[in-house]
């Protein structure tokens, strides 16, 4: 930019003032015309290309990215993973529609579910006219209403955010409904009709019926069963149920040089533990008053539940500092959870009779194997997740299987398919989250799953292959239950 001396500037101003009024008006009109032309050109550019910013249109066959608001890659990656779960989006739609029907609920009380649904719907849409980059700032504002604050430029964890979202949605769902007025006959009649449908009479049964609350929870909600058994008399305690939203799997100790699989992590999770110095009531009754060498016989029990261990690739050094584990764990696109399904005594007898009939008419060598194990048996000796939820969320490190094996899942009742993988690059103190997820399925397609995979890192999106997905070092795995029986696939 040229600079003028102070004397030169003053001289130009004096000459402009000495000119006549007509000359000055003409110059002002010329300047006005130039300014009007520039404004018209700017308006045309705005109409044709929109505002001058980073706003872009979504490419065909892609999904929108998410703007990083300052170390919010953990939130962006989790939202992309949730957007790849069709059953969760359907549940969220029903949940928000029920909230909108309740006139007593304010927008502030339902802000979290509405903000989350709008984001997930946009991230799973096929409309090519939508924005290429979205802003999840509204979800952060909704989370602050639930006493969860994210400081700027502070590292966070995607797994912790997942539990914050699920617990906040449950808190929003479990709020007490309004009390109907005595003269509100329409509401009272509806409540009576709904109660009559749930009324049933049972003369007896091994377990009490499960409350309907289990069926209304979000799709990630599941149950773990456990019980204790004495090693001496084999007396078993009643089955105990624990709820979960995700399974945090630890890496078992494997012989060096051998790969670690997701099935091994699951088996390690449910492996039995021996608890000593616990008195067995049944043995106490049988051995009442009996002494051996002047001492009461010590009875022992064993529990068949493995408590939740530290997952998240976390271990501790000799100095006591946390270290991220780098082992690769193989995971597959399809996962059969039949062997992890808890069966009651009656179900086990029916399953055994059907299995015996199948063995009598088939060669044992031709038995189908899923996940490397016999998938048609229910294991009733250990507590398992019941598999009755449409989506399961497995928290585990992982790497894919490089073996070209053919698995027959035609007999699998609880078959799940991989929908998203979250990967963490970095160490325990800093890093970056990215997501591998399936592209949204076609609206008129027969399958809810698309075969096209995408790599998403905040606002960057590109296509990826299944081999790249299965070769990644996973931090979070999302599996969706399949509803089509008789499926035979190749890994």
Curated annotation (Swiss-Prot):
Which CDD domains does this entry report, sorted A to Z? Peptidase_C19F
Q: Where in the cell is it found?
A: Mitochondrion outer membrane
- The UniProt entry annotates the active site at 73 (nucleophile), 432 (proton acceptor)
> Does the record's keyword annotation contain Oxidoreductase?
no
**Alphabetical list of InterPro entries matching this protein:** Papain-like_cys_pep_sf (IPR038765), Peptidase_C19 (IPR050164), Peptidase_C19_UCH (IPR001394), USP_CS (IPR018200), USP_dom (IPR028889)
Question: Which biological processes are named by the entry's GO terms?
Answer: autophagy of mitochondrion; mitochondrial fusion; protein deubiquitination; protein K11-linked deubiquitination; protein K6-linked deubiquitination; proteolysis; regulation of protein stability
Composition-biased stretches (Polar residues): 346-355
The transmembrane residues are 32-52
Q: Which residues lie on this side of the membrane: Mitochondrial intermembrane?
A: 1-31
Q: Where is this region: Disordered?
A: 346-365
Question: What name appears for this protein in its UniProt entry?
Answer: Ubiquitin carboxyl-terminal hydrolase 30
Q: Which gene encodes it?
A: usp30
